[in-house]
Amino acid sequence: MELKNKKWTDEEFHKQREEVLQQWPTGKEVDLQEAVDYLKKIPAEKNFAEKLVLAKKKGITMAQPRAGVALLDEHIELLRYLQDEGGADFLPSTIDAYTRQNRYDECENGIKESEKAGRSLLNGFPGVNYGVKGCRKVLEAVNLPLQARHGTPDSRLLAEIIHAGGWTSNEGGGISYNVPYAKNVTIEKSLLDWQYCDRLVGFYEEQGVHINREPFGPLTGTLVPPSMSNAVGITEALLAAEQGVKNITVGYGECGNMIQDIAALRCLEEQTNEYLKAYGYNDVFVTTVFHQWMGGFPQDESKAFGVIVTATTIAALAGATKVIVKTPHEAIGIPTKEANAAGIKATKMALNMLEGQRMPMSKELETEMAVIKAETKCILDKMFELGKGDLAIGTVKAFETGVMDIPFGPSKYNAGKMMPVRDNLGCVRYLEFGNVPFTEEIKNYNRERLQERAKFEGRDVSFQMVIDDIFAVGKGRLIGRPE
C-alpha cells in the first residue's frame, strides 16, 4: 500500500487482515464479530477508554505500573498482586522483546524454557503466542482495565489478538515505537503498520466498542526536549484520529525541571486538541499520561523513592490523567512484584496528598509554555509543508531532512544531528539544532539559557555537559555539574 494520511477503506483493511492473521497460528482465533460481542460485555470499570474519561472528568490522576512475565499463571499472579497489594488503577501487560521483533518462534522457546526453569526467562508477556484465549484469561482474572505496553514497530498481529482478548488499550505509534526501538525499520513501513493498528481500533469504535490508543511520549527517555516529543505525540494523535480512533492519551516523559514539565504536559494537551479540531476531528477525547523519570536511576532504594515521588508530584500538579510508575529496583533490573507494588504505593500516596491541587499560572510557567508551543509549531508546520498537507508523507520527509530528530535514537532513518542539554535550572534545551526548523528568536533563547549555565559552572557549553547530564540522576542530582 502507498502511504498517505487517509482512512483505509474496509476493502484495504480486510485484505491486509487476511495476511496479518496468518503470521502465527493464534491469528486464527480472532473473529471480529465475536470479539465485538465479547468486548461489549466488558463492564465499564474494566474498559480503559471509559475509565480514562471518568478520571478526566473527576480531575484525578491515576497510577499504572509496567509489568510482564513469560508464564500465563505467573503473569496473572503478578497483575493481581499489583492490583490488590499495590493499588494500581490500570494494569499493563508489558510485552517481551521477541514479540516486539515478531520472532514468535523464539517466544515459544522462551515459554518452554521458562516452564523448565520455573521462572520467567522472557522480559515480558508473549501475548501473540498465548493468543486470544490467553489474553482473555488474563483479563478475566483481574478487576481493572488492561493495556498492552511494548515497543513494537509492526504491532498488527499483537493488536488484533490483544483487542479481541478484551484489552481496551494499545500503546505505541509509527514514530514512537520505531525510532527509539529499532535500527532498520523504515518510517514509511512503521507508519503503515500503525495505520493498521489504528484502523482496527477505528473499526471497533464503529461497532460501539471504545478502545484507547496511547502514543509513547518519552521516546528514547534521554533528554528529549519537550517540543520534539510533543510534536511526535501530536503527529501520532492526528494519524490515529484519521483512522477513526476516538480516545487518545498523549504522553510525556519527565525531564526534571518542574516548571518545564508542567508547561510541557499542558502544552501537549492544549496543542493536541487544537490540531485535532483544526483538521476536523471534533469527537476525539484527549487525556494525558506523565511518565516518571525514564533515565538512569540511583541504585539506593530510598533515593529511587525520592525520584518516584518527585515525578508523581509533577504529574499531579500538571493535571495528568495518568502516571506511569517506576520501581525502586529500576537501576538493578526487572523488579520483584513487591518492589513494583512499593513504587505504586509511594506514587498513590503522593497522588492522594496532592488531589485537586494544581500549579497556578506564573510568569515562569507562562514563558515556558509560550516557548514550547512556538517550538512545537515550527516542527509541525514544516512537516505539513514537506508533506504538501499530508502529515504521513510529511513525517517520512521530516525524518529524511532532520526536521524531526530524536536524540540518541538507534534508527538509521533518524538524523541524529540535534543534541539536547540542560540549562542552569535543569530545563532541557537544544544544544545543536541540526535541521530542526526553529526561528532565530527561538534559537537565541536556547543559546542564552545555555550560556547562563556555562557562566555558572565556569566552563564552555559543550558535549561534556550532555554526558554529565545523562549520568546525573543516577549519581543523585538532576544537573550534571562538573566535579
From Swiss-Prot:
* Entries under InterPro entries matching the protein: Cbl-dep_enz_cat, Glu_mut_E, Glu_mut_E_C_dom_sf
SUPFAM superfamilies the UniProt entry points to = Cobalamin (vitamin B12)-dependent enzymes
Keywords in UniProt for this one?
Cobalamin, Cobalt, Isomerase
- Pfam name, any one: Met_asp_mut_E
> Which pathway is this protein assigned to?
Amino-acid degradation; L-glutamate degradation via mesaconate pathway; acetate and pyruvate from L-glutamate: step 1/4
What are the BP-aspect GO terms?
anaerobic glutamate catabolic process; glutamate catabolic process via L-citramalate
The enzyme's E.C. designation: 5.4.99.1
Residue positions annotated to bind adenosylcob(III)alamin are: G68, N123, P180, F297, K326, E330, I334
What does it catalyze?
A: (2S,3S)-3-methyl-L-aspartate = L-glutamate
- Regulation acting on activity, per entry: Competitively inhibited by (2S,4S)-4-fluoroglutamate, 2-methyleneglutarate, (2R,3RS)-3-fluoroglutamate and (S)-3-methylitaconate.
- Presence of keyword Transport: no
Sites binding L-glutamate sit at R66, R100, R149, H150, E171, Y177, Y181
Q: Which GO terms describe its molecular function?
A: cobalamin binding; methylaspartate mutase activity
Cofactors needed by this protein, per the record, are: adenosylcob(III)alamin
Complex and partners: Heterotetramer composed of 2 epsilon subunits (GlmE) and 2 sigma subunits (GlmS). GlmE exists as a homodimer and GlmS as a monomer.
UniProt similarity note: Belongs to the methylaspartate mutase GlmE subunit family.
Role summary: Catalyzes the carbon skeleton rearrangement of L-glutamate to L-threo-3-methylaspartate ((2S,3S)-3-methylaspartate).
Put simply, this protein is called Glutamate mutase epsilon subunit
Gene (UniProt): glmE
